[in-house]
Amino acid sequence: MHWLSYYKKWVPQENYYYASEHTGFMANPDGRSEGTYSKYASLDDKTDGFHWYMAYVKFGVARATSDASQEIRSGHLTRDEGIALVKRYDGEFPRRYLPQICEYLGMTE
């Protein structure tokens, strides 16, 4: 398996700007993704929020931590900004697709 990041530095925010400028890619029309502050990643994955929420339950870190860490390393956020975003969004329960996830798993809310 080959990943694009093997060949090109992967910086999500810069990739978003490139895609929106050159391909017409549009950010999430509903605003940010649940559990984080970004509005341009995992837009087509209804299970992603639950994956990250369970990571928060199990490990104490989730999507906002991952996103902020990448953006701090790439110079798009300061450490203090990242900490504030993580405190605000990590652990947020993903309600948007809860009915569909429950139906898929054969569960009730």
Task: List each language-model region with its residue ranges.
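Nucleotide-activated chemistry modules centered on ATP-dependent adenylation/adenylyltransferase
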Residues: 1-109
